[in-house]
C-alpha cells in the first residue's frame, strides 16, 4: 500500500514537472512570437515597401503612339522634388477644361495614359504626371498620399503660371493617385472637381492585401510597429490616423466628386469606396460601379460604362449640375446593386453581375 502511494506521488510529481515544462515552453513560444511579429518582422515589411519604391518601372510608350501632340514638362514641387509629366493640349481652340491626371503606387504615368488619350479626344487638355518617388519624378518615400497630395497643387500652379489653365480644373487620380487627389482637393483651392478611381480607405487595406505583413495586419499594434520601422528607414513619422481617408472625405462639403469602383477589386473594395462616398457631404457626389472589374480594370473592363459616366459628370460640372435629382435616383440604384453584390459574396453565393 505504501509502495502504491509512493508510486502515485512519483507519477504526480512527474506530471507536475511536465506541466511546468509545457507552460514554460508555451510562454517562450509566445514571447518569441511577440518579438518576431512586433520587433523583427515590421522592418522586413518596411524594407519591402522601400525596395518596391526604389525599383521604378521604365516608360515604354508616349502619347505619340496614339497620334497625340505632347510636351515633356518638369514641374517644381515641395520638398525640392521635381515632377515629370506630359502636357497634352486639347485639339479644340477652346478646351472644355483642364485635367491633372496621375497613377497608382509603384507605377508611372503610363498606367493612366489610356484615360488621358480618351479625355484629350473629348476636348480636354491633360497634364499626366508621375507622382513623386515614381517614374521619372524626383525621389520621395511613399507616404500614402500625404506628401503626394502636394503634387496636384504644384501642377496646377505650374499651368497657371503659364496661363495654360482652362476652367474647370479637375484633379483625377487612380488608386494612390485617387487618395492624393482627395487630400489635395480638401487642402487647396485650385480644383473645381475630383475624380477618384479606386481609392484605398486605410493603411490596413494595403498592408493586409498587398504586402508580406498580411497575416498579421489584424493584430493590435502591428501596423503601428510597421510605421515605426518605416520611419527609421525613411524619416516619415506616420500614424494609422494620418493615413485614414475617411476624415478627409468628410471635409469635402461642396466640391463635386466622382468615385469609381470595380466589382472585383480586391484592394480598394467596392463596399469601402461606397463608404467613402456615403461620408462625403458634397451635394454633387457620384459613385460609378463597374461590373466584373478588378483593381486595374475599371477603365478597360467595360469602357463604355466608364467613359459614359465620366463624361456625364464632366458635362454636368460645366453646366452646373442641372439634373441633380435624376442622379440621386440613379445613385440609389447603384448603391443597392453594390450592397446586393456584397451580400451575395458574404453568403458565399454567386450571381451574374448586371451589365
What does each model-identified segment do?
Residues 21-76:
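An N-terminal hydrophobic leader/cap segment in hydrolases
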Residues 105-118, 131:
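The serine-hydrolase catalytic nucleophile loop
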Residues 111, 142-163:
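Alpha/beta-hydrolase active-site loop
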Residues 118-138:
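Conserved alpha/beta-hydrolase
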Residues 183-238:
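Hydrolase active-site cap/lid region
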Residues 252-253, 259-261, 265:
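Short beta-strand/loop motif that positions the catalytic acidic residue
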Residues 266-272:
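Conserved alpha/beta-hydrolase "acid-adjacent" motif
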Residues 293-303:
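Catalytic histidine-centered segment of alpha/beta-hydrolase-like enzymes
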